[in-house]
Regions:
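Helix-coil boundary and N-terminal low-complexity module in membrane systems
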Residues: 1-148, 152-199, 207, 248-347
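Membrane-interfacial helix-loop-helix connectors in multipass membrane proteins
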Residues: 122-143, 213-239
C-alpha cells in the first residue's frame, strides 16, 4: 500500500481497542504459520521457508540489540512502499527465496561432510552384513564414529554460526571459526538449551518418519491407507509438520538470541574487539552498547573448552536418526538432510 495509506492504517490500529489489536495480531500470526506449514511440504517450498526462518533469526537478534519487540517478517509484501505493484506485493517472497538458496548452499558445504560419512557407515555396514565380508567388519562402525564425531562438533558450532550468517547476510561468517567459537564460549551453560531443543525436534522427526511403518496396522488409519496411500502420506507429513515448525522456530529463536547476547557480553568482557564485528552487527549494536574499539583479551585453549564442552550432549540427536532409519528406512536423503539442520522438510 502507498506510504500515506500505510501510515493511516497504523494510526487506526493504534486507536483500535486492545482486543481488536490482539485479535488481528493473532490472526496474522496464524496466517504466517499456515504459509510456513504449506512451504514445508516440498523441497522448493522448504528453501523459501529456510529463507523466512533466517529473516526471523535476524529480527530476533536485532530485537536483542535494540531492545525492541520481535516482529515476524512478512511473507509477501515489501518492507518499503517504493516500486511498482508487483514489487510491493511480492518483494518479501523473492527475498526469502534468495536468502534460502544462499543459506541452503552454505549449509550444504558445512553439513554434508559429516552427513555423507554417516550415510556411508550405514551402507557399508549393511553391505558387509549381507555379503559376509568379515575382514571389513570395522569399516562401517569406524565411519559411523567418525561421522557422528564430526556431526557433534558441527552441531556445537552451527547454531551460532547460522545465526550470524542470518543476521548479517554474509555467508563467509558461517566459516569464521575463531570468532564464532569465541561467541559460543560466552554462554558455556546457556548453550545447554540448544542440544535439548534440537533433540526434541529430532525425536519428532524420528516419530514422523519411523511411525509410518506401523500406520497400516492401526485400525484408525487402515481405511485411509488402503483408500489412497499417496494422499495418506501427504496428510501424514502435513500434520506432523505442525509441531515440527513450532520447534523449528523455537530452536532458531534460541540460537539467534544467544548469539546476539554473546556479542554484547563479549564486548563488555573485552573478549571480542568492536572492530572485528561485521558492519551490520556494529550498526545495530551501537544503540545497545556504546563501546570503543578496545584491546581484546586473549582466549586461547580456555575459549575452546568453554565453547565445545557440551559436544557429547549432541549424541542423542544422531542416535535418534539411526533408530529412525532402523524402524523406517527412507534412503540417502534421510541421512543427508536432517530437517532441523538443513532443509525444513520432513519427508
Amino acid at each position: 500500500m502507498p506510504q500515506g495509506s500505510r501510515e493511516a492504517y497504523d494510526r487506526r490500529m493504534q486507536r483500535a481497542p486492545r482486543v481488536v489489536r490482539a485479535f488481528l495480531s493473532a490472526l496474522t500470526a496464524i496466517v504466517r504459520f499456515a504459509i510456513a506449514l504449506i512451504m514445508a511440504q516440498s523441497v522448493v517450498g522448504a528453501i523459501v521457508l529456510l529463507g523466512y526462518v533466517y529473516r526471523r533469526m535476524q529480527n530476533h537478534a536485532i530485537a536483542v540489540w535494540t531492545g525492541g519487540r520481535f516482529q515476524a517478517p512478512k511473507w509477501l509484501f515489501a518492507l518499503e512502499s517504493d516500486g511498482g505493484f508487483f514489487h510491493r506485493h511480492t518483494a518479501s517472497l523473492w527475498l526469502h527465496l534468495r536468502t534460502g538458496v544462499a543459506a541452503s548452499l552454505s549449509l550444504a558445504v558445512l553439513t554434508l561432510p559429516s552427513a555423507v560419512t554417516i550415510a556411508l557407515s550405514w551402507y557399508t555396514g549393511w553391505n558387509n552384513s549381507f555379503y559376509k565380508g568379515y575382514e571389513y567388519a570395522l569399516v562401517g562402525p569406524l565411519l559411523g564414529v567418525l561421522g557422528i564425531g564430526l556431526g557433534m562438533l558441527l552441531m556445537t558450532y552451527l547454531p551460532y554460526a547460522q545465526a550470524r550468517h542470518a543476521t548479517t547476510g554474509e555467508w563467509r561468517l558461517l566459516f569464521s571459526w575463531r570468532q564464532n567459537l569465541q561467541l559460543i564460549s560466552m554462554h558455556p551453560f546457556a548453550n545447554l538449551a540448544l542440544p535439548i531443543i534440537y533433540f526434541a525436534t529430532g525425536l519428532l522427526v524420528a516419530g514422523a518418519r519411523g511411525l509410518l511403518t506401523f500406520a497400516p496396522q492401526w485400525r484408525a488409519l487402515q481405511g485411509a491407507v488402503e483408500a489412497d496411500p499417496g494422499q495418506f502420506l501427504t496428510n501424514w507429513y502435513f500434520y506432523w509438520s505442525v509441531p515440527f515448525i513450532l520447534l523449528l522456530f523455537v530452536a532458531k529463536r534460541v540460537g539467534a538470541r544467544l548469539y546476539a547476547s554473546a556479542i554484547i557480553k563479549g564486548l563488555q568482557n573485552r573478549r571480542i574487539a568492536h572492530g572485528e564485528l561485521h558492519d551490520a552487527e556494529r550498526y545495530y549494536i551501537r544503540g545497545a552498547l556504546a563501546i570503543a574499539d578496545t584491546t581484546k583479551l586473549s582466549g586461547g585453549f580456555a575459549t575452546l573448552i568453554r565453547a565445545l564442552w557440551p559436544v557429547l550432549l549432541w549424541l542423542p540427536l544422531f542416535a535418534a536418526l539411526y533408530i529412525q532409519q532402523f524402524i523406517h528406512f527412507i534412503g540417502a536423503w534421510g541421512w543427508l538432510n536432517h530437517p532441523i539442520v538443513w532443509l525444513p522438510v520432513l519427508f
